[in-house]
A protein has these predicted regions:
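Positively charged n-region of N-terminal signal peptides that target proteins for export
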Residues: 1-4, 725
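Sec-dependent N-terminal signal peptides
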Residues: 4-12
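Solvent-exposed alpha-helical segments and adjacent loops
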Residues: 20-762
């Protein structure tokens, strides 16, 4: 009885708060936008009531408008309630939609629900067939940590014979729709046992900030510890946009802050923790190398969380930073004292979450996939990512897909089929002919390796139609289904080698610097006398690497040129240097030895190859026609841009040196910030030099000598080229056999002629 009373009360409430509908005045015009504080997303002040606009596109990851097709269609989106928000009355869902003008209003409706509670049912009329916005109040009490926003549409265009696949049956939900949260910030619960919360939580929205308070006199070990903390947090925040800030004092911001360093290096620590809190017995008798991690609420502002990573000495600070990777396994409460860190890192080179296994033959279950079933006329495509490093070279022969699938009984074998698409190209389809259905059927498909690259997307689509399908009769489609089994196997015959240097490969998850996920073979080389800007630039690059990896530990090193003593400290590492000849001796040495194209005097005269349209023979045999052109970079570009230049390491031919270069230190951040902006990163094209200016205009220049980098023997490389150029070699073989035939024929003819002459003489 109480449940019935509750439901009646809810409908009365929603009736009193009827949704307001704003319509367009004319077709083709955009929805009128009302500017508000929520649109500009100002930084919250942690006082009073705040608002946040969570858009479908940016916050709910809806990349394109949602289209609901057919007589009946549903779509679900998941959204969260951030743990540090107390949601208030006045929160709203703004849905922007349009639909086919052919729909009958008496039979067509769009219903919107949150957590199975219907907020509104809208009749689909000609008036709202153009882009229309409806505003739905959200009762705060129906929200949970994770919520489901559902759209259900019933749509019809005629009272007579009706085709369920008619193009007139559609309703579209715009990706510009959004949820407007009205909330009051609340104090977080701070406990190292749930790290990285509250410094990051998957339920949060928007760009996440990592705010460091700069040590006043840091050592390279402390800077390395800061980098470790940044790397770890960036890894947690990999699917969100990240902004890294450095403040000289915690009072410069009211956001969560992170303080790294010894108390001597970073005296700001004492504003949040006394000596008694930091070390037992005020540090008396504590052994060198001991680290301490403290997480607590700011005593002066409980809504702010503070993370302190400190130690008796810089080595203890670094140890505390590495301990954050273990998280709740070894950390608890608001303080943890770190004596030793026993890191267990089982990842091998090239092993990375979300990437295909290293072995040539694997099952989809090894990618984390489970048996997946889809139903109905509009069965959703089953998407499978097949990611690999950019130096993977696939052999044309021997790569196969053995698709294992099942489908229901009662399918029309003339119309129902399964289709496999790789990188948006259909490669095979097969009719589902068995009226009784099939279990664990197989489809063996040779994989066209010429379609494959570093980022491969395989899509399997079931096109399902019930037996005796009649568009003029209403037939249920929920009983027809298809399943892809996780035991499906893929064989990809491949080796790993690539032409270097090529800076653009860094856009593929930081290649080659992240082949080891803990980056144990990477050295970051700061200027001799580094400053705050240099440290910020380092953290920007580390943030990108952290977002692109899935490590179990962190092992890269941060050094200055004076620490690069002896070949053993450089030959086994990729080196990444920041600055220019004036402030970084290592860069100056590379420039003096003529390893770099970018110099303090400008940029060398660059001759590049301009790609032209391929001729008939080039299309058959591969390769590109080239014409020499001169690449000119204006002085303005040189002065105002930041550069990434990559060269083969002079210490190890299988390693590289990446120079982050600019005449002006402030310009160094442009290419580093570009790495954190996906739409800019995609503009990185093949080249050993990439320039990015303040407008994020990207220029790629491909000059200098190339070499094959990779662990591959001569015969394997020969096998690859033979397999890749089978057509060319076949034609050359035919030509060679023809020439051999002509030579043999000429010899035989000459021999016959000579014999004939000898016989005539006799």
């Amino acid at each position: 009885m109480r449940k019935v009373t509750f439901i009646l009360a809810f409908f009365v409430l929603t009736g009193l708060n009827a949704a307001r509908i704003r319509k367009k005045t004319a077709p083709g015009k955009p929805v009128k936008k009302v500017k508000s504080a929520a649109q500009t997303q100002p930084a919250p002040s942690y006082s009073g009531i705040q608002t946040y606009r969570a858009t479908f596109e940016k916050d709910l990851y809806v990349k394109k408008d949602i289209t609901l097709k057919g007589l009946h269609a549903t779509e679900r989106l998941t959204f969260t309630r951030p743990p540090r928000w107390n949601i208030l009355e006045g929160s709203e869902i703004h849905i922007i939609f349009n639909h086919s003008e052919a729909l009958l209003p008496s039979l067509s409706h769009l219903s919107i629900a949150v957590n199975n509670i219907t907020l509104k049912s809208v009749t689909l009329t000609k008036e709202n067939s153009v882009s229309t916005e409806i505003v739905l109040p959200i009762p705060p009490y129906i929200l949970e940590d994770y919520n489901v926003l559902s759209f259900l549409v019933d749509q019809h265009y005629t009272l007579d014979c009706e085709d369920p696949f008619s193009p007139a049956l559609w309703t579209k939900i715009s990706k510009k729709s959004y949820i407007l949260f009205k909330y009051r910030p609340i104090s977080p619960i701070v406990n190292l046992g749930v790290f990285p919360h509250p410094f990051f939580d998957k339920r949060d929205y928007g760009t996440r900030e990592i705010n460091f308070v700069m040590p006043s006199i840091p050592t390279t070990t402390t800077i390395q510890a800061m980098s470790y903390v940044d790397f770890i947090l960036s890894n947690y925040i990999s699917f969100r946009n990240v902004r890294v800030n450095i403040f000289r004092s915690a009072s410069e911001t009211d956001k969560d802050v992170i303080l790294v360093g010894t108390v001597k290096e970073n005296p700001e620590i004492l504003k949040f923790a006394s000596t008694d809190e930091l070390f037992p017995s005020k540090g008396v008798g504590v052994s060198p190398g001991t680290g301490v991690i403290i997480a607590k609420n700011d005593p002066r502002n409980p809504r702010r969380a503070v993370l302190i990573v400190t130690g008796v000495d810089p080595r203890g600070v670094e140890k505390a930073a590495r301990a954050l990777f273990a998280g709740s396994k070894i950390l608890s409460g608001q303080r943890s004292i770190i004596y030793e860190v026993n890191e267990v890192d089982t990842l091998k080179e090239r092993e990375q979450k979300g990437y295909i296994p290293l072995k040539k033959k694997f099952e989809l279950s090894e990618l984390g996939m489970v048996d997946t079933t889809v139903r109905g006329f509009y069965a959703k495509p089953i998407d499978i990512n097949l990611f690999t490093q950019p130096d993977a070279q696939f052999f044309p022969k021997g790569s196969r897909l053995k698709l294992i699938y099942s489908y229901s009984a009662g399918l029309d074998g003339r119309l129902s089929m399964i289709e496999v698409i790789i990188n948006q190209r259909s490669v095979v389809s097969k009719l589902l002919r068995n009226k009784a259905g099939e279990s664990f059927a197989t489809l063996d498909v040779p994989l066209p390796t010429w379609l494959l690259g570093p980022r491969n997307h395989m899509t399997v689509i079931f096109h399902l139609f019930p037996i005796n399908f009649d568009p003029c009769r209403r037939i249920s489609d929920k009983q027809i289904w298809g399943t892809i089994h996780a035991s499906t196997t893929i064989k990809l015959d491949r080796e790993y080698f690539v032409e270097m240097p090529d800076v653009s490969l860094i856009k593929f998850s930081g290649y080659p610097y992240t082949l080891w996920q803990n980056m144990k073979d990477v050295l970051f080389v700061l200027p001799d006398k580094f400053n705050v800007e240099d440290i910020h630039n380092l953290l920007l690059l580390v943030t990108y690497f952290g977002k692109e990896t899935s490590p179990q530990s962190v092992k890269f090193k941060v050094v200055t040129p004076g620490m690069l003593s002896g070949p053993d400290y450089t030959k086994d590492y990729h080196l990444i240097a920041f600055g220019n000849e004036s402030n970084n001796r290592f860069i100056r040495d590379l420039s003096d030895r003529k390893y770099l194209y970018i110099t303090k005097k400008g940029i060398k005269s660059l001759k590049t190859f301009e790609k032209k349209k391929k001729s008939f023979w080039k299309r058959i045999f591969g390769g590109e026609e080239e014409g020499i052109t001169t690449e000119v970079i204006k002085a303005y570009d040189y002065d105002s841009a930041g550069f990434l230049e990559q060269v083969i390491s002079p210490f190890n031919k299988n390693k590289t040196v990446l120079v982050v270069y600019s005449r002006n230190t402030a310009n160094l951040r442009y290419p580093l910030e570009a790495l954190l902006i996906p739409r800019i990163l995609t503009k990185f094209k093949k080249g050993n030099i990439i320039a990015v200016n303040s407008s994020f205009e990207v220029r790629s220049i491909d000059v200098g000598k190339k070499r094959i980098v990779g662990k591959v023997g001569f015969f394997k490389k020969l096998r690859f080229y033979i397999a890749k150029h089978t057509l060319l070699l076949s034609i050359l073989l035919i030509i060679a056999l023809y020439l051999l035939y002509k030579v043999v024929r000429a010899i035989v003819d000459a021999y016959k002629k000579r014999r004939l002459m000898e016989e005539e003489e006799e």
